[in-house]
Design a protein with these regions (language model features):
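Phosphate- and other anionic-substrate recognition elements at nucleic-acid/protein interfaces
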Residues: 2-8, 15-139
């Protein structure tokens, strides 16, 4: 029996990682949670466990580009982290240009949530779902 695999979306940051998942059909991205970063080893372990639990075979990660199109300052750290996650979880890694994903996430949240504190708690995972949905819409 062929079990459908999900895709995971990540919005990588220095302090937090936003997490989203696709439905099993691969059409719709949904925010899941925000990982408050501790250290890289624990972060990789947590995400690997989540990947196995949710039956994920592809991880879509936002790669920070500057508006000029050049890789942003944090891009190298994102790529290093992605390589370690790929080794640990044995998944395919896909990078998506994440320019303006946080701005779009903030705009979406402003429409429904007035409290900045509540929006801040959800921002990274909503941004991860936008990154993942961008990929799903192009495949």
């Amino acid at each position: 029996m062929n079990v459908s695999k999900r895709l995971m979306g990540l919005d990588f940051g220095k302090a937090r990682i936003g997490i989203a998942f696709s439905d099993i059909m691969g059409f719709l991205a949904t925010p899941h949670s925000t990982l408050k970063r501790t250290n890289e080893e624990d972060d990789i372990k947590y995400l690997t466990n989540l990947i196995n639990e949710k039956n994920v075979d592809t991880v879509v990660i936002g790669l920070p580009f500057e508006m000029s199109g050049n890789k942003g300052e944090i891009a190298n750290a994102v790529e290093e982290f992605a390589n370690k996650l790929k080794e640990s979880a044995n998944v395919k890694i896909v990078f998506v240009d994440e320019r303006l994903s946080s701005v779009e996430a903030e705009e979406q949240l402003k429409q429904t949530i007035k409290s900045w504190e509540k929006r801040k708690q959800l921002l990274d995972q909503v941004s991860a779902s936008i990154i993942l949905q961008t990929y799903l819409d192009t495949k």
